[in-house]
């Protein structure tokens, strides 16, 4: 993650992972940790959800009892610059403690509140979700140049990544893997996805969203997320329809807009002994 993010978002938000690095943790003193806690761990920067078969009045009394005395920090919300796209392809090779060669290609995409967000997620599923996906069918089944492949989105408030990955065999040629992936990306960017592909992706999304609401925990987590990012818990009732409303043209436009070579990072991972050779 850190290798992709530091290259994709250089000098931008998300250049480093939210959890930080061991260097960050080791350099932080007690005073810094206490100030961070006071600034961010406050009731005006938190969302409390109580879900389940509860008595509303009793739950409110308990909330006031245990949390009512906590004072707001009045911390101003951080402002972040917009993500910069199409800054030129970044390519690098990393020799690490891996047994098999692997390729990661990441395209910068808009945040989860952007109008293209759902189209981008469906696009990633058409590319690399399951054995019938374009990537698996071409790279694993037909060309047999990789053991595994797939695609997914890493989405955040103002930006994210559509990540394509592929793990090769011991003697796989990573340049061939990158070339094959690029060919599939180019094809989906210049020709429309099929109705069948889009319907399959939508069905998977609908199943995942509805199954996630089958438990009290799932409902509570969804409500908290919708309020945190959208200030709208009502989205829990129309989230599925927002995906179902995405058209083939929406997916096509997203592919053309974001799946560009100048908008991506290409990382090749090779075993350390390859460098020695």
Task: Provide a role label for each language-model segment.
Residues 1-23, 45-51, 101-110, 140-245, ...:
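M16 family metallopeptidases and their MPP-like homologs
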Residues 105, 115-127, 134-137:
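Active/ligand-binding-proximal structured segments within catalytic/core domains
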Residues 118-122, 140, 248, 255:
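PPIase-associated folding chaperone regions across multiple families
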Residues 10-11, 18, 23, 43, ...:
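An aromatic/glycine/proline-enriched structural segment found at the starts
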Residues 61, 113-117, 173-177:
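Solvent-exposed, non-transmembrane alpha-helical starts
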Residues 25-29:
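Short, charged, amphipathic alpha-helices and their helix-cap/turn boundaries
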Residues 245-277:
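In a subset of proteins, long, contiguous C-terminal domains/tails are tracked
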């Amino acid at each position: 993650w850190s290798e992709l993010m530091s290259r994709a978002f250089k000098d931008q938000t998300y250049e480093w992972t939210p959890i930080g690095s061991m260097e960050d943790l080791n350099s932080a003193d007690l005073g810094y940790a206490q100030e961070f806690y006071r600034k961010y761990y406050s009731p005006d920067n938190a969302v409390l959800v109580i879900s389940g078969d509860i008595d509303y009045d009793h739950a409110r009394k308990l909330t006031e009892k245990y949390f009512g005395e906590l004072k707001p920090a009045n911390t101003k919300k951080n402002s972040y610059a917009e993500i910069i796209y199409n800054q030129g392809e970044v390519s690098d090779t990393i020799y690490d403690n891996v047994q098999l060669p692997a390729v990661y290609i990441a395209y910068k995409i808009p945040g989860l509140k952007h109008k293209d967000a759902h189209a981008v997620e469906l696009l990633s599923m058409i590319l690399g979700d399951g054995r019938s996906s374009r990537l698996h069918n071409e790279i694993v089944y037909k060309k047999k140049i990789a053991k595994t492949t797939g695609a997914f989105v890493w989405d955040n408030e103002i930006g994210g990544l559509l990540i394509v990955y592929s793990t090769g065999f011991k003697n796989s040629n990573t340049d061939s893997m990158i070339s094959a992936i690029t060919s599939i990306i180019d094809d989906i960017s210049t020709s429309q996805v099929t109705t069948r592909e889009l319907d399959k992706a939508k069905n998977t999304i609908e199943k995942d969203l509805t199954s996630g609401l089958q438990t009290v925990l799932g409902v509570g987590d969804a409500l908290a997320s919708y309020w945190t990012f959208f200030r709208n818990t009502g989205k829990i009732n129309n989230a599925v329809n927002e995906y179902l409303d995405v058209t083939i043209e929406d997916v096509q436009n997203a592919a053309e807009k974001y799946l560009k070579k100048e908008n991506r990072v290409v990382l090749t991972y090779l075993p350390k002994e390859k460098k020695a050779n």
